[in-house]
Amino acid sequence: MSRYTGSIWKVSRRLNYSLSETGKELIKRPYAPGMHGKKRIKAKDYGLQLQEKQKVRFTYGISEKQFKKIFKDAGKLKGIHGEMFLFLLESRLDNVVYRLGFAKTRQQARQLVNHGHILVDGKKVDIPSYSLRVGQIITLKEKSKDLIIVKEALANKLNRVDYISLNKELVGKYVRIPHRDELLPNIKEQLIVEFYNRK
């Protein structure tokens, strides 16, 4: 399954979950896409597991193939599988660029990385899935600071997170691994574990 590039607003309403983490998609039309939305049917176990997986996959904007690979990688780490999975998703370079406020959306952040605007420890990294390590430094190329999308994003004053720092010179740092309560509080990651572990 390829990465979804359509409207996250429609997907948010379908899942009844804010993929932008702002809640804006659900304010005006808190129902599924369609004339008046489709009647919500109570999901069974499989449906709940699938829905939870889709919420997280669409939040981070990655393909099913990538998503499943990260899930498998998380299973090799010490710790609770579901939590390790969220930590790996959160440490992706495109996500951290978004968290730093260099882009308004993760999709924009992915484009910045793809087009070579981002440096990690002073070296260009153009792989959105690059997994950052604690202590690494993330910056924009000097010329890239003048990009309109970057200026607009920085002016947006996104609520930044404590595990990623940013100074006045726009030097970002992946300070520490986030705590579980700092990530997607409305997500039940155990349902995703059950989805992939089902027989």
Curated annotation (Swiss-Prot):
Role: One of the primary rRNA binding proteins, it binds directly to 16S rRNA where it nucleates assembly of the body of the 30S subunit. With S5 and S12 plays an important role in translational accuracy.
Q: Which top-level group of life is the source organism from? A: Bacteria
Q: Give yes or no: UniProt keyword Ribosomal protein.
A: yes
SUPFAM superfamilies in the cross-refs: Alpha-L RNA-binding motif
Q: Which Gene3D superfamilies match?
A: Ribosomal Protein S4 Delta 41, Chain A, domain 1, RNA-binding S4 domain
List residues traversing the bilayer: none
User: Which CDD domains does UniProt cross-reference here?
Assistant: S4 (cd00165)
Q: What is this protein called?
A: Small ribosomal subunit protein uS4
Q: Does the keyword Repeat apply?
A: no
Task: Output the GO biological process annotations, alphabetical, semicolon-separated.
Answer: ribosomal small subunit biogenesis; translation
Q: Which InterPro entries match?
A: Ribosomal_uS4, Ribosomal_uS4_bac-type, Ribosomal_uS4_CS, Ribosomal_uS4_N, S4_RNA-bd, S4_RNA-bd_sf
Keywords of the record, alphabetical order, are: Ribonucleoprotein, Ribosomal protein, RNA-binding, rRNA-binding
Q: Which GO terms describe its cellular component?
A: small ribosomal subunit
HAMAP family reported in the protein's UniProt record? Ribosomal_uS4_B
S4 RNA-binding domain residues: 91-154
Q: Which Pfam families match?
A: Ribosomal_S4 (PF00163), S4 (PF01479)
**Subunit structure comment from the entry:** Part of the 30S ribosomal subunit. Contacts protein S5. The interaction surface between S4 and S5 is involved in control of translational fidelity.
> What's the family?
Belongs to the universal ribosomal protein uS4 family.
Coiled-coil stretches? none
Q: Which GO terms describe its molecular function?
A: rRNA binding; structural constituent of ribosome
